[in-house]
C-alpha cells in the first residue's frame, strides 16, 4: 500500500467513520451481552459522561438498574470514550494514532470476546489502514503500527466452530499482510517482524487449519518475504571486511506452535477477568486522577519512544532464514510435514531470487546458505521421493547455482554428483534410500534444464570453475556426457518419455552457444591469435596431477618428489611445499598432510605452513577451527604437541598488536550472565597460554561430541581446569564461556572423519563442505571469471570443452536422427549436426570433422556399395528415362533414385552433405577417405542421371574448346510421352518388359530424389568452390578413373571417364599447382584414348582434352606427338575433313598453332615427320590453310631452323600444295579476258583473291628457303636444293598466270643472281637446269599451259643457260637438252625467234 492524501480516498469525514465503527461494535457487543440494559448503562458510566461523573454516588445509586463497577465492560467503555472524545474534539486532528486504535486493539486481543466481535474489530482496523485514516502525519505512528501488529499476532477470542474461528484468523492474516507490505511495515522492529513471521508461518504449517486460511497465510508469508529481502538490497552493507566464524547453532530459531486465536486455558480466562475488574475500578476514578494518570502514561510513552527498538533490518532477516532452516534440516525431518518443508524451501528460494546476490556481503547470511541450508537441500535430493518436496528443493538448488554458483563451488559439485548417481540408479554405500522413480528423475532433469536455459554459457562456466581446477572434478564434461546419455530414446525405458527431449535440449543449447560464439569471430583471426592459456595448460595436466596426488596420499615423500618433478611445486624449498599444501589440498588426503607436518624432521616445513594462516582478530577456538580445515590432527600426543606448539607461536604473534573483537561482548550474548565493563578487556595470551588453551579446546571437542563419553564436562569443570593458565592468571570468564559454548554448539569437524555407514551423509558433507565454510568473509568485489575473458579466450575454452565431448555428442545425435520419427526432430538434429561439423572445422578437429561428414554421406544412400544397395532393393529395375514432350523435362527412374526418394532423412542428409562441402574454405581438413566418398557420391548421381552436369562450371570450358555438352549415361530404356499424367504408366507395358516396369510410386520417389539433388547443387558445391580445390582432390578424381569396362559399368563407362577427365582438366587448369598434375593427367588420357570400344565422339573429345593440355601445360608427356601419331594420322575415320571443319576441330587446330607459335622449333613434335604429314592432311581443309601457312611463314622466314631431310621435303610438299591451291584463280582471269575481248565490263574483284595471295606467299617462302641458304645454322644439301628448284619450276606451270609468272620470276632471280649461294661445289649449275628446270617440260601439265607462259619460261631458260655459259659451267649436253625443249615449240614464231637469239648469243659467247 502507498500513502495518498486522505481526501482522495474518503468522501466522508474520517471522524464520522470511526464513530460509526464504534457504534457498530458497541451494538454487536450489547446484543451478545446477557443483560443489554446493564451493559448499556455501564458503558455510559464507564464512558465518563458528564451527567453521571459530576453527580454524587448517591445520585448514581438511585438508578436501580445500574450495575456496580465490578460489572463494567472496559471494551465497550473504550469505544464509548473514543466516540465521546471525537465528538468533543470535533475530529481526529488532536488524537494520537494509538488513542484511535487502542479500543479496537483491546477487542482483538481480548480472549473473552466472541469471534464475531473480533471479526468486526478487525474490519474496523482494516478500514483504518486501508483508507489511510491514520498515516505518517501522526506523531506516534510508529508506536501505533507496532501496537497494532502486536495485537494482531496475539489475537484472542472465544472458541466456536472451526470454520468460524478460521474466518476470523483469515482477516488477521490479511490485515498483517496489508500492513507489513505497505509503507507502514517499515515502522516495525526486528522482534515484531519475527513474531509476525512465527505467527503466520505456524498458521501456514498447521494442517488442522482450513485450506483457505493456510493458503492465505502462505500468501502473506510470501509477501513478507518479498518485503524483507527487498529491503536487504537497500541496506548499506558493512563498510569493512567482516570475517564470520561458523560456530553457532542453527537450531535456535524453531517454529512455535500455532496458538493464535482461541483461549488455551481457564487460567487465561480468569486472568482476563481479573484484568477487566481492575480496569473497571480504574474507570471509576475521579476526573482529576484520570487526567493525572493519562499524563503519566504520556510521559512513559515518550520515554519509551526515546529507547524504542530500531526498525527491522539484517537481524530479523538472519533469524527468519534460521526459522525457515529449522523446517528443512535433516535432524528435524520427523517434526514437520512435507507441506511445511515445501513452503520453507519455496520461501528460501524467493529470498535467494530477490536478493541472493547480496548474501556474500553478509557473512552470517551467506554462512547459513552455504552450510546448513545447502546441506538440507542435498539431503532432501538424495533421500526424498516426495514429488512436491523434491520439486521445491530442486528449484532452490537451481536458484543457488544461478545466483550464487560462483561462491558455492564444492556444494554444487557434491550435489550434482549425487544427482548424477540418482539418474544413473547407483547407490552410495550405506544409502538406504530406494532408487528414484521415473517421475522423480524426470523432475530432476526438468529443474536442471533451468541452468542451461538461464545461461547459454552455463557449461562454459562450469568448465572454467571445475574442470580447469586441479582440485575439482570434471563436472562440466561429466554433466554433458550425462545429458547425451539420457538424450537417447532408449533412456526413456528406465526413466520417462520426457527425459530424452529435455536432455537433448541441454546438449543442443551447448552446441548452439558455441556455434553462435564462433560466428562472431573470424576463424583466420582465431587461428592466428590464439595463445596458450595457463588454466587450460593446467587442465591438460590434470590427469597427471591426479596421479601425483594419489601417489602423495599413499606416500607423502614420494608424492612431493613427483609433484616437484612434474612442476606442480616450484621447488623443493619448504616455502614452496608449504604453499602447495596450503593452497592445493582439495584432493590431498588431510591425514597424510597432518602426518607430514608433524614429522620431527619437517619442523621448518610445519612453521612455513602455519605462517600462511592469518589469526588476527580471532579467538583461539576460532583459529583452531580454521587451522584444522587444512589437515587432520594426528592421533599421537607428541605429534599433536608439535603442531599445537607451532600454532601457539603463530597465534600469539598475530595477536600481539590486535585485540580480539567480538560483536556480542557487551551484549553478553551466549554468556551465562550479563557482563560488566570490567569484563571487556583485551585477551592477549602468550604462546604458553595459547598452547594450554589449545590442548583444552581439543580435549573439550572430543569430550563434547564423542558418543562414547557419557559424563560430559561442564563449564565449571572446563574453567577450573584452566585456572592460572592465562599469562599466570585466570582467563576472563566470559572468554572461556565463549569458547565452551562454541565447542558445545558446533563441533570442530576433523577432515577425513568417518562414523560408519549410518552417518555417511554427515561425513560426506563435513569432509567436503564444512572445511570451506568454517570462516566466511565478506566478498564485495567478486566477479565471474567468465566476464573477464576476451572473446578469443572464451573460444579456446569452448574448444577444450568440445574436444572432450564432440565424439559422444555426435554419436548420440546420429543415433537420435536414425530413430527419430518426427520430421521436425530430424531437422533439428540435422541442424545440430551441421553446427557440430562447423565447430569441428573451426577448431581444426580434422578426424571428427571427416568422420561426421562421412557418416552423413553414408546416410544419403548414395555411398552404399553396389552389393549392399542390391540387398536393400526388393525389386531391381533398370535405369528408365522418361521424356515428357510438353514440358521438355526428363524423369530418371532407377533403384538409386527410388531409395533416395523414399527416404526423407537421406534427402536431408544429401542436402546438408553438399552444403557442408560447399562451405569448406580450408581443404587441408578433408581426408583422402572423405574425398573418395565425395567423388563416389557425385559419380553415383551421374550414373543414375540424377544431376545435370552442364553447369557454368562445364559450359565455360565447353565454350572455350567449342565442345558439345558432356554425354550422359545411356538409360536402359527410354520413353517419350506427349505429357505427364497419372495414367502414364498404363502405357509403359508396350515399352517395358515384365518386372522392369516402374510403378507410379517409383516415379514419384524419383521425382523427389531429383528435386533433392537439384536443391543440393552437388557439382557446384564441390567443384565451383575454388577454396576447396586441392591436390588431394585432383588425385582422388584421377584415381577414380576406371579404365576397365565391365558388365556392371558398361552403361556409363565411357561417359564417366569423360566426366572425370573433364572435371580434372578444368580444376588443374585453374589451380596454381596445375603443372604438377599435367603429366599425370596426360598419362591417364593417353591410356584412355588407347582403349578399345570408345565411340567416335569420345575419341574426338579426348583430342580436344589433349590439345588443351598441350596449350595450357606446355605439352606434358609430349602428348602432342601422341595426338598426331595415334589420333590425327591413324584414326582417319574420325579426324577427317568434316572434323577439321567442325567447331571443336577448328578450335583444336587453333590451339595447336597457338601453342607452336609460343615455343621453339626444337620441340620434339616439330622434328617428327609425322607432324608435317599431318599438316599436309590439314591443308585439305580450306579453312585451315591459312593457319598452316602462318605457321610455316614464321618458322621459315625467321631463320634458325633445323630440318632434316624428311622434314624439308615435307615442307616443300606443303608449300607446293599450298601454291597449287591458287590455280583456282585462272577462272577469274579467263572471265576477265573474255569480258575484255567481248567489250563487257570486267569483274570488280577476284573472289579467289585470298587463295591466290596465300599461294603467292607460299611461292615466296619456297624461294626464301633457297635464298637463306648459308645464312642459317644448317646448309641445304644437293637433293634439297634441287627439290626446291623443282618446286619453284613446278609452280611456273600454275594455271593462274599471276602465280606462274611469280614463280618464274623467283626462279630467275635465284639462278641468275650473282649473290646466289646455289653456286656451290655440292650442286653443279647444269645439274640444276637438267634436274630442276628442264624436267617440267616433260610433265603432262605443260600441255595445258598457254604458249605465252611457255615463251616466258623458255626466255628464262635461255637466260639461265647463257649465264652459265658465260661462267663456263655448262656443257654441250645441257645445250642439246635446252635445244630439244625449244624444238618442241619451234612452230611458234615467238619461240622460233627466241631459239635463233639463243643460238646467236651462244656463238658470240663462245667466240669471246
Swiss-Prot record:
Keywords from the named record: Cytoplasm, Endoplasmic reticulum, Guanine-nucleotide releasing factor, Membrane, Mitochondrion, Phosphoprotein
GO molecular function terms listed in the Swiss-Prot or TrEMBL record: guanyl-nucleotide exchange factor activity
Gene3D superfamilies per record: 1.10.220.20, Arf Nucleotide-binding Site Opener,domain 2
GO cellular component, one term: Golgi cis cisterna
Entry membrane topology: Peripheral membrane protein
Keyword Manganese in record: no
Modification sites for Phosphoserine: 49
InterPro entries in alphabetical order: Mon2/Sec7/BIG1-like_HUS, Sec7_C_sf, Sec7_dom, Sec7_dom_sf
Record's subunit section: Interacts (via N-terminal region) with SEC21 (via C-terminus). Interacts with GMH1. Interacts with DRS2.
Protein name as annotated: ARF guanine-nucleotide exchange factor 1
Protein source organism: Saccharomyces cerevisiae (strain ATCC 204508 / S288c)
Amino acid at each position: 500500500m502507498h500513502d495518498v492524501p486522505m481526501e482522495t480516498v474518503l468522501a466522508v469525514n474520517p471522524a464520522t467513520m470511526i464513530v460509526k465503527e464504534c457504534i457498530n461494535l458497541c451494538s454487536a457487543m450489547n446484543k451478545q451481552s446477557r443483560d443489554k440494559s446493564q451493559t448499556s448503562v455501564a458503558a455510559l458510566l464507564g464512558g465518563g459522561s458528564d451527567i453521571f461523573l459530576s453527580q454524587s454516588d448517591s445520585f448514581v445509586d438511585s438508578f436501580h438498574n445500574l450495575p456496580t463497577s465490578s460489572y463494567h465492560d472496559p471494551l465497550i467503555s473504550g469505544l464509548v470514550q473514543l466516540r465521546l472524545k471525537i465528538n468533543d474534539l470535533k475530529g481526529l486532528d488532536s488524537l494520537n494514532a494509538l488513542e484511535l486504535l487502542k479500543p479496537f486493539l483491546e477487542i482483538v486481543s481480548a480472549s473473552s470476546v466472541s469471534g464475531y466481535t473480533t471479526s468486526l474489530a478487525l474490519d474496523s482496523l482494516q478500514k483504518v489502514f486501508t483508507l489511510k485514516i491514520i498515516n505518517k502525519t501522526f506523531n506516534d505512528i510508529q508506536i501505533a503500527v507496532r501496537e497494532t501488529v502486536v495485537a494482531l499476532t496475539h489475537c484472542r477470542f472465544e472458541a466456536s466452530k472451526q470454520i468460524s474461528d478460521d474466518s476470523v484468523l483469515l482477516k488477521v492474516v490479511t490485515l498483517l499482510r496489508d500492513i507489513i507490505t505497505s509503507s507502514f511495515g517499515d515502522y516495525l522492529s526486528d522482534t515484531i517482524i519475527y513474531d509476525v513471521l512465527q505467527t503466520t508461518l505456524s498458521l501456514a504449517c498447521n494442517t488442522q487449519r482450513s485450506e483457505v486460511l493456510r493458503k492465505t497465510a502462505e500468501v502473506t508469508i510470501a509477501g513478507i518475504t518479498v518485503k524483507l529481502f527487498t529491503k536487504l538490497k537497500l541496506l548499506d552493507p558493512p563498510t569493512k571486511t567482516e570475517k564470520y566464524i561458523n560456530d553457532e547453532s542453527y537450531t535456535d530459531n524453531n517454529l512455535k506452535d500455532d496458538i493464535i486465536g482461541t483461549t488455551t486455558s481457564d487460567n487465561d480466562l480468569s486472568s482476563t477477568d481479573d484484568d477487566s475488574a481492575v480496569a473497571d475500578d480504574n474507570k471509576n476514578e475521579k476526573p482529576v486522577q484520570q487526567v493525572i494518570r493519562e499524563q503519566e502514561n504520556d510521559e512513559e510513552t515518550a520515554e519509551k519512544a526515546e529507547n524504542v527498538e530500531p526498525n527491522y533490518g539484517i537481524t530479523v532477516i538472519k533469524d527468519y532464514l534460521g526459522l525457515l532452516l529449522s523446517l528443512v534440516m535433516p535432524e528435524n525431518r520427523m517434526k514437520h510435514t512435507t507441506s511445511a518443508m515445501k513452503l520453507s524451501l519455496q520461501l528460501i528460494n524467493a529470498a535467494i531470487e530477490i536478493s541472493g546476490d547480496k548474501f556474500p556481503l553478509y557473512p552470517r547470511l551467506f554462512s547459513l546458505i552455504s552450510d546448513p541450508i545447502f546441506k538440507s537441500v542435498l539431503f532432501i535430493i538424495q533421500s526424498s521421493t516426495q514429488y512436491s518436496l523434491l520439486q521445491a528443493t530442486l528449484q532452490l538448488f537451481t536458484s543457488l547455482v544461478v545466483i550464487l554458483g560462483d561462491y558455492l563451488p564444492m556444494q554444487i559439485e557434491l550435489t550434482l554428483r549425487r544427482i548424477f548417481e540418482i539418474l544413473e540408479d547407483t547407490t552410495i554405500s550405506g544409502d538406504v534410500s530406494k532408487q528414484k522413480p521415473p517421475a522423480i528423475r524426470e523432475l530432476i532433469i526438468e529443474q536442471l534444464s533451468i541452468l542451461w536455459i538461464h545461461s547459454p554459457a552455463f557449461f562454459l562456466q562450469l568448465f572454467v570453475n571445475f574442470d580447469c581446477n586441479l582440485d575439482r572434478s570434471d563436472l562440466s564434461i561429466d554433466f554433458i556426457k550425462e545429458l547425451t546419455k539420457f538424450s537417447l530414446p532408449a533412456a526413456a525405458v528406465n526413466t520417462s518419455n520426457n527425459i530424452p527431449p529435455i536432455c537433448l535440449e541441454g546438449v543442443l543449447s551447448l552446441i548452439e552457444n558455441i556455434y553462435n560464439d564462433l560466428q562472431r569471430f573470424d576463424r583466420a583471426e582465431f587461428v592466428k591469435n590464439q595463445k596458450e592459456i595457463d588454466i587450460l595448460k593446467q587442465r591438460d595436466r590434470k590427469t597427471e596431477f591426479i596421479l601425483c596426488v594419489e601417489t602423495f596420499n599413499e606416500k607423502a615423500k614420494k608424492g612431493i618428489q613427483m609433484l616437484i618433478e612434474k612442476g606442480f611445486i616450484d621447488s623443493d624449498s619448504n616455502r614452496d611445499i608449504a604453499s602447495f599444501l596450503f593452497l592445493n589440498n582439495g584432493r590431498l588426503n588431510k591425514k597424510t598432510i597432518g602426518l607430514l607436518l608433524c614429522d620431527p624432521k619437517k619442523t621448518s616445513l610445519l612453521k612455513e605452513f602455519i605462517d600462511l594462516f592469518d589469526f588476527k582478530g580471532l579467538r583461539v577456538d576460532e583459529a583452531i577451527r580454521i587451522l584444522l580445515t587444512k589437515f587432520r590432527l594426528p592421533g599421537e600426543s607428541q605429534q599433536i604437541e608439535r603442531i599445537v606448539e607451532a600454532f601457539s607461536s603463530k597465534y600469539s604473534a598475530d595477536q600481539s598488536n590486535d585485540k580480539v573483537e567480538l560483536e556480542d561482548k557487551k551484549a553478553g550474548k551466549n554468556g551465562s550472565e550479563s557482563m560488566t565493563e570490567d569484563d571487556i578487556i583485551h585477551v592477549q595470551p602468550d604462546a604458553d597460554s595459547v598452547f594450554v588453551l589449545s590442548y583444552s579446546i581439543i580435549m573439550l571437542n572430543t569430550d563434547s561430541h564423542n558418543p562414547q563419553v557419557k559424563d560430559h564436562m561442564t563449564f565449571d569443570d572446563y574453567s577450573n581446569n584452566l585456572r592460572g593458565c592465562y599469562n599466570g592468571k585466570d582467563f576472563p570468564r566470559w572468554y572461556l564461556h565463549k569458547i565452551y559454548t562454541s565447542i558445545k554448539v558446533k563441533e570442530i569437524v576433523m577432515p577425513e572423519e568417518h562414523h560408519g555407514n549410518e552417518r555417511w551423509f554427515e561425513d560426506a558433507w563435513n569432509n567436503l563442505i564444512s572445511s570451506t565454510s568454517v570462516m566466511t568473509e565478506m566478498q564485495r568485489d567478486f566477479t565471474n571469471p567468465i566476464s573477464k575473458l576476451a572473446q578469443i579466450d572464451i573460444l579456446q575454452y569452448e574448444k577444450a570443452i568440445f574436444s572432450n565431448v564432440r565424439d559422444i555428442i555426435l554419436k548420440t545425435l546420429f543415433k537420435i536422427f536414425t530413430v527419430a520419427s518426427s520430421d521436425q526432430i530430424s531437422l533439428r538434429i540435422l541442424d545440430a549436426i551441421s553446427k557440430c561439423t562447423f565447430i569441428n572445422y573451426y577448431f581444426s578437429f580434422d578426424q571428427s570433422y571427416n568422420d561426421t561428414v562421412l557418416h552423413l554421406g553414408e546416410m544419403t544412400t548414395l555411398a552404399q556399395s553396389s552389393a549392399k544397395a542390391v540387398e536393400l532393393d526388393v525389386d531391381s529395375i533398370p535405369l528408365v528415362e522418361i521424356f515428357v514432350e510438353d514440358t521438355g523435362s526428363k524423369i530418371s527412374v532407377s533403384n538409386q533414385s527410388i531409395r533416395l526418394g523414399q527416404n526423407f532423412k537421406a534427402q536431408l542428409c544429401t542436402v546438408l552433405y553438399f552444403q557442408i562441402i560447399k562451405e569448406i574454405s580450408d581443404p587441408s581438413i578433408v581426408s583422402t577417405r572423405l574425398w573418395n566418398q565425395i567423388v563416389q557420391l557425385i559419380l553415383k548421381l551421374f550414373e543414375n542421371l540424377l544431376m545435370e552436369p552442364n553447369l557454368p562450371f562445364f559450359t565455360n570450358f565447353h565454350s572455350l574448346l567449342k565442345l558439345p555438352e558432356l554425354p550422359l549415361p545411356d538409360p536402359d530404356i527410354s520413353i517419350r510421352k506427349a505429357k505427364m499424367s497419372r495414367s502414364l504408366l498404363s502405357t509403359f507395358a508396350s515399352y517395358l518388359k515384365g518386372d522392369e516396369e516402374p510403378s507410379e510410386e517409383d516415379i514419384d520417389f524419383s521425382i523427389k530424389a531429383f528435386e533433392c539433388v537439384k536443391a543440393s547443387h552437388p557439382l557446384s558445391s564441390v567443384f565451383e568452390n575454388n577454396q576447396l580445390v586441392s591436390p588431394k582432390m585432383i588425385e582422388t578424381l584421377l584415381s577414380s578413373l576406371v579404365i576397365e569396362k565391365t558388365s556392371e559399368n558398361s552403361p556409363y563407362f565411357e561417359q564417366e571417364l569423360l566426366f572425370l577427365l573433364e572435371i580434372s582438366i578444368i580444376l588443374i587448369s585453374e589451380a596454381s599447382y596445375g603443372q604438377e598434375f599435367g603429366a599425370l593427367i596426360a598419362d591417364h588420357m593417353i591410356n584412355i584414348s588407347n582403349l578399345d570400344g570408345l565411340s567416335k565422339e569420345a575419341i574426338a573429345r579426348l583430342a580436344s582434352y589433349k590439345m588443351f593440355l598441350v596449350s595450357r601445360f606446355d605439352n606434358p608427356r609430349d602428348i602432342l606427338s601422341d595426338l598426331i601419331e595415334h589420333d590425327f594420322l591413324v584414326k582417319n575415320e574420325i579426324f577427317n575433313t568434316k572434323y577439321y571443319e567442325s567447331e571443336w576441330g577448328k578450335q583444336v587446330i587453333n590451339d595447336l598453332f597457338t601453342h607452336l607459335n609460343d615455343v621453339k622449333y626444337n620441340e620434339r613434335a616439330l622434328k617428327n615427320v609425322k607432324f608435317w604429314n599431318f599438316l599436309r592432311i590439314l591443308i585439305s581443309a580450306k579453312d585451315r590453310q591459312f593457319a598452316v601457312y602462318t605457321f610455316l611463314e614464321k618458322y621459315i622466314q625467321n631463320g634458325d631452323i633445323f630440318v632434316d631431310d624428311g622434314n624439308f621435303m615435307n615442307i616443300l610438299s606443303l608449300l607446293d600444295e599450298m601454291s597449287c591451291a591458287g590455280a583456282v584463280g585462272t577462272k577469274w582471269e579467263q572471265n576477265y579476258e573474255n569480258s575484255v575481248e567481248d567489250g563487257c565490263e570486267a569483274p570488280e574483284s577476284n573472289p579467289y583473291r585470298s587463295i591466290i595471295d596465300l599461294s603467292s606467299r607460299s611461292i615466296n617462302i619456297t624461294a626464301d628457303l633457297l635464298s637463306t641458304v648459308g645464312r642459317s645454322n644448317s646448309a641445304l644439301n644437293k637433293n634439297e636444293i634441287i627439290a626446291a628448284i623443282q618446286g619453284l619450276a613446278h609452280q611456273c606451270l600454275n594455271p593462274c598466270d599471276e602465280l606462274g609468272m611469280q614463280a618464274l620470276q623467283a626462279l630467275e632471280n635465284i639462278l641468275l643472281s650473282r649473290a646466289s649461294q646455289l653456286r656451290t661445289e655440292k650442286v653443279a649449275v647444269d645439274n640444276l637446269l637438267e634436274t630442276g628446270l628442264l624436267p617440267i617440260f616433260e610433265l603432262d601439265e605443260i600441255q595445258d599451259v598457254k604458249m605465252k607462259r611457255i615463251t616466258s619460261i623458255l626466255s628464262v631458260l635461255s637466260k639461265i643457260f647463257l649465264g652459265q655459259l658465260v661462267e663456263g659451267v655448262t656443257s654441250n649436253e645441257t645445250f642439246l637438252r635446252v635445244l630439244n625443249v625449244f624444238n618442241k615449240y619451234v612452230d611458234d614464231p615467238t619461240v622460233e625467234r627466241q631459239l635463233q637469239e639463243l643460238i646467236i648469243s651462244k656463238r658470240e659467247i663462245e667466240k669471246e
